[in-house]
Design a protein with these regions (language model features):
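Helix-biased "structured C-terminal domain" signature
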Residues: 1-480
Length: 480
């Protein structure tokens, strides 16, 4: 519907593209974000993110494109359970599932293809919901371009996860070797805020330019971003603009004391030392990337999730084995994803089996999973008891609390207990401002509430970025 833009003191531009109600109902999001070194680039980025989210979520929700089956029943499928398990090898909850059980569980599968174009099937809903660090959704000018962008994204996440988990001390890029005027302008903008910028080589020896930017916003906290590109310049600009973009996120700040290696200057290299994979076409770049991951002992799978109505090429990418960025703060583990998928395909027996066996670290996990299983069995009254108990526990996982408040609030709304419904709504907004859950609690017309909730989200976004909104095209606020 609209785009909202603002300019960071570093000179980078950021955009929030406001989706229509249809976008919201499919993705659960109000907006999509973009950033760039100019207005058009930021606007373009937000619209591409809008397109990729809409296309991918719509594809995964399409039952006509979902095949319910198991590893055992999908004979001669190129994608094996080893490809799935390789990306969660560090997850302790994996021991709760026996290999033969995983082979027999019914899952939702989507048609994909490997690096050679061979048809195969992947449980993409499970991958998209759980393995966030190893799947990439990207839009492009062509399907090959979308595949390149998606593959670069998963390689970025894999590199960052490897650096974080192993505590690797990578080379510092000498800022004197940076000649690009746009990059130098952004860095100077950061310095004008009193921030210090450390640019590091995150390529990990792969023939792919990968740059990490660690920016100290004060002596104790910093922001870290990693980006790749076809050239060192492209990777640097992407990492710098993303670093400015995530500044408004309160949870993106890291402690300097816990990651001192990002500020070490023991080993320096020139940005010219980074590899260059630029080629004449997206297909040539894609072939180079496929060769790179193959030489690293990795397998890559793609899925064309382009929406016919939109007509914008979108691809999902899965890389195995790949390191997954930890999701522990949101309670995501292998069991989390598997139980959710089993409930989606109505395999209550399989979900119940895992639920009984799992010895979760805290009681809130049991209460959450048990409540969701009862919801799937249409035993809402029993489920509500578990959700009420969960809210009484000292639960640190926001998603568990959000879901519990949602079901309790919906129940109160249906019973016309406006006071309790309002209490649950207020609690939801405090946990997650702009959450789509209140749309189901506020009134009988979600379409009307959608507009109100969307405006609330926009105000919160503007409030987060208020310190960086400058005089912009004659208006002393963010441009609509």
């Amino acid at each position: 519907e609209d785009c909202y833009l603002y300019r960071h003191p570093s000179g980078t531009f950021h955009c929030q593209a406001k989706g229509a109600y249809r976008y919201f109902t499919i993705t659960g999001n109000f907006f999509a974000s973009g950033r760039g070194i100019c207005l058009d680039q930021a606007r373009f980025g937000s619209l591409m993110e809008l397109s990729e989210r809409y296309s991918a979520f719509k594809f995964l929700a399409n039952l006509k494109k979902t095949r319910i089956s198991s590893f055992d029943r999908l004979k001669n499928n190129i994608f094996t359970k080893e490809h799935l398990l390789a990306n969660c090898a560090d997850d302790p909850s994996l021991s709760l599932v026996k290999p033969e059980e995983l082979s027999g569980f019914r899952l939702g599968w989507q048609k994909c293809f490997d690096s050679l174009g061979n048809i195969c099937y992947l449980p993409l809903r499970l991958i998209a919901d759980f393995l966030e660090g190893s799947n990439g959704i990207a839009a492009g000018f062509s399907l090959e371009d979308a595949m390149v962008r998606g593959l670069l994204e998963v390689i970025e996440r894999d590199s960052l996860a490897r650096i974080e988990s192993a505590g690797l001390n990578t080379a510092l890029i000498d800022d004197r070797s940076i000649e690009d005027s746009q990059a130098k302008k952004i860095i100077q903008g950061f310095l004008s805020l009193g921030h210090s910028v450390f640019i590091r080589d995150f390529s990990l020896g792969r023939p792919l330019p990968m740059i990490g930017v660690a920016r100290k916003v004060d002596p104790s906290k910093f922001l870290l971003t990693v980006s790749s590109g076809l050239t060192g310049r492209e990777a640097l600009l992407r990492a710098l603009t993303e670093n400015a973009q995530i500044e408004s996120g309160r949870f993106n700040l890291r402690l300097v004391s816990k990651k001192p290696r990002y500020f070490s200057a023991k080993h320096k290299i020139s940005i010219k030392d980074l590899p260059n994979i630029k080629a004449g076409s997206s297909k040539q770049v894609l072939d180079r990337l496929k060769e790179t991951v193959s030489n690293c002992g990795m397998a890559v799978f793609f899925c064309d999730v382009t929406d016919e109505e939109l007509g914008i090429p979108v691809a999902m990418t899965y890389l195995s084995p790949a390191k997954v960025v930890s999701q522990k703060e949101e309670g995501k583990d292998f069991i989390f994803g598997l139980i959710d998928e089993l409930l989606r395909v109505n395999d209550k027996k399989g979900a119940g089996l895992l639920l009984k066996r799992a010895k979760f670290k805290d009681r809130t996990r049991f209460l959450f999973y048990r409540g969701n299983k009862l919801i799937a069995e249409d035993k809402k009254e029993q489920a509500l008891c578990y959700f009420r108990q969960l809210l009484k526990e000292n639960c640190s996982i926001s998603r568990f609390k959000e879901d519990s408040l949602y079901w309790l609030g919906l129940d109160a709304f249906k019973r016309q207990d406006k006071r309790k419904a309002k209490d649950y709504l207020t609690a939801l907004v405090k946990i997650k401002p702009g959450s789509f859950y209140p749309a189901f609690l506020y009134c009988a017309s979600p379409d009307r509430f959608f507009k109100d909730a969307q405006q609330l989200y926009l105000k919160l976004w503007l409030a987060d970025n208020y310190g960086y909104i400058r005089k912009f095209e004659g208006e002393d606020h963010c441009q609509k």
